[in-house]
Structure formats: C-alpha cells, structure tokens
Amino acid sequence: MAVQQNKKSRSKRGMRRSHDALSTAQLSVDATSGEIHMRHNVTADGFYRGKKVINK
C-alpha cells in the first residue's frame, strides 16, 4: 500500500480541493413556450432552439 512520505499542509489540501465544488445547472427560457429547461437540451414539450424536434 502507498504511504505518503511527508504530511500535506492545509494549504496544499485546500488547493487540491478547490476544483471539487459543484456548479449550478445552467437554465434557459424557451423562446416559443416560455418553459424553463437545461441548456443544450430539448424541453419537455419537444422544442429545441425554437423548433419542434420531437412529435408526441
């Protein structure tokens, strides 16, 4: 098993963890229906970038 040779400082630990934060989901409002959806994803009623792409 690997064992560290020297103790990592709080600063180095914090620098490593600085990239671990989660970002919030990017939301957009659809131009045609006004529905809120995730960016680069089809809305629930089948629109993407103002065009109907899924027929239900």
From Swiss-Prot:
It holds the Pfam family Ribosomal_L32p. Residues 7-16 have a biased composition (Basic residues). Residues 1-26 are annotated as: Disordered. GO terms for cellular component: large ribosomal subunit. It comes from the Bacteria. The keyword rRNA processing does not apply. Keywords: Ribonucleoprotein, Ribosomal protein. GO terms for biological process: translation. One of its GO terms (molecular function) is structural constituent of ribosome. The keyword Ribosomal protein applies. Belongs to the bacterial ribosomal protein bL32 family. HAMAP family: Ribosomal_bL32. This is Large ribosomal subunit protein bL32.
